[in-house]
Amino acid sequence: CKAAVKYPPNGLPALFNGAGGTGKSFLSRLMYEYAVNERVIGTAGAASLPPYITVDCSEYAQNEEKFAISLCGSEDGKGWLAKANGGILFFDEIDRLPFSGQELIYSYLISGQYKGYHDDEHVFESNARLIFSTTKVPAETLYKPLARMIPIVIPVPTLHERTADEKEEMLVSFLKEEGRRMGVDVSISQNAFHCMLEFSYENNIDELKTCVTSSCAGAYLEKTSDGIAIHSYHLPEYMLSSLKLEVEDKDKRMIHLNSYSRDTSLGQTVQYFQIMLDVFEDYRQ
């Protein structure tokens, strides 16, 4: 993943491969943040950040012409490749794109050049870096020449496949993130914390984050000067009905996230990468 960002001159195309809700779009955004923080893209002191553009390929599954115009532009070449110049262009669910669209992407990766839609006279250049995601087997669903042009394929595991420590750190990170967003300190009872950890999330990380948000929203209605305190009764009802709660007094034992011992001194972007996928091992050394 580090190689995908830093490989000269314009990085390497990378593909996140995993089930729905595992955080592929999230990881793509973090790759962008890492590239910005490492000054691989963008200019120091610039007034604005380099571009980051997300393309939902499912929107173009039945409209090849619209995709071609959006990607390359017309005679002026002002499509996504131009708008993402100097930044990152993320193709979500690339397998949903017809082969004709994937072939346009392949042609750009070959040379860094492209032509406007129905324009054979003008040739444009871009140094946009490309990231892809898919829930399918790449070798079976992608345009084969394009699949061969993506040297870095990163498997993204489901929550069920992650270790207990990974789940715990992820949960704490999401709770802290929600607390920062609301501008409050967050604490959570041991019962509620263990319920969140033990629950089987069908929609993976997306569902875990939704659970955190809804629980914080419920606790916010009882906010005090000390912040918010999440208890078992703030959890979604479907979660409570599927898990056996422990003794009641444990719901009074609180975990204060500001002093949570698993937190590290690394920046937030690198922490998330380490939690979700072990791609920054050499960066920490």
Locate the predicted segments by residue:
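Conserved C-terminal helix/linker of AAA+ ATPases
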Residues: 212, 218-249
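Conserved AAA+ ATPase "SRH/arginine-finger" region at the nucleotide-binding site
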Residues: 153-167
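Walker A/P-loop
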Residues: 14-50
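Pre-Walker A (pre-P-loop) alpha-helix and adjacent loop at the N terminus of AAA/AAA+ ATPase modules
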Residues: 1-14
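Conserved AAA+/SF3 P-loop NTPase catalytic/coupling segment centered on the Walker-B
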Residues: 28, 60-68, 81-110, 139-149, ...
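C-terminal helical "lid" of AAA+/P-loop NTPase domains
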Residues: 194-197, 206-221
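Short conserved motifs of the RecA-like P-loop NTPase core
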Residues: 184-200, 227-232
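Conserved catalytic/switch belt of AAA+ P-loop NTPases
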Residues: 100-125, 129
